[in-house]
Amino acid sequence: MAPKAEKKPAAKKPAEEEPAAEKAEKAPAGKKPKAEKRLPAGKGEKGSGEGKKAGRKKGKKSVETYKIYIFKVLKQVHPDIGISSKAMSIMNSFINDIFEKLAGESAKLARYNKKPTITSREIQTSVRLVLPGELAKHAVSEGTKAVTKFTSA
């Protein structure tokens, strides 16, 4: 009787070690441990089907880009010229970078002046600080024109 009892735990231990080894392998992969937790509750393959349904509920994350606006400006300036996807990606990154710099500078200015709100004045000052010379002057005039048009409409 005792040898049989020893064989059963010995047989169970390797079986228990294999899922532990699989868990160790799957843990760095991200969402794999969550799927493994669902398997015993969902009883096998049905659990993996539920994982797919959960994926459908979340849907795709929308990525906001400036691509359509870049294209519209390009067509206003040069109607006959196109743009490659790589160039579009570079332009999108450029606009995101400038936006982050202006937002950061505007936030600093608001903090320095102990104001809780970023207004057009902070944006205008940050444009003058971030952009060089003539570019800053043109950006300020275009920005002022856009704000005036927005408030009058």
Swiss-Prot record:
Q: Which UniProt keywords apply?
A: Acetylation, Chromosome, DNA-binding, Isopeptide bond, Nucleosome core, Nucleus, Ubl conjugation
The annotated crosslink position for Glycyl lysine isopeptide (Lys-Gly) (interchain with G-Cter in ubiquitin) is: K149
State the residue spans of region: Disordered: 1-60
UniProt PTM comment = Can be acetylated to form H2BK6ac and H2BK33ac.
Q: Give its localization.
A: Nucleus; Chromosome
Enumerate the GO terms in the molecular function aspect: DNA binding; protein heterodimerization activity; structural constituent of chromatin
Q: Which GO terms describe its cellular component?
A: nucleosome; nucleus
Q: Which domain of life is it from?
A: Eukaryota
What the entry lists under InterPro entries is as follows:
Histone-fold, Histone_H2A/H2B/H3, Histone_H2B, HISTONE_H2B_site
Q: What is its main location?
A: nucleus
Q: Which is one Pfam family of this protein?
A: Histone
- What are the boundaries of the signal sequence? none
Residues carrying N6-acetyllysine: K7, K37
Here the segments flagged for biased composition (Basic and acidic residues) are: 1-28, 36-53
PANTHER family with a match to the protein in the record: HISTONE H2B
According to its UniProt entry, what is the function of this protein? Core component of nucleosome. Nucleosomes wrap and compact DNA into chromatin, limiting DNA accessibility to the cellular machineries which require DNA as a template. Histones thereby play a central role in transcription regulation, DNA repair, DNA replication and chromosomal stability. DNA accessibility is regulated via a complex set of post-translational modifications of histones, also called histone code, and nucleosome remodeling.
Entry's family note: Belongs to the histone H2B family.
State how it assembles: The nucleosome is a histone octamer containing two molecules each of H2A, H2B, H3 and H4 assembled in one H3-H4 heterotetramer and two H2A-H2B heterodimers. The octamer wraps approximately 147 bp of DNA.
**Name of the protein this chain belongs to:** Histone H2B.7
* The organism of origin for this protein: Oryza sativa subsp. indica (Rice)
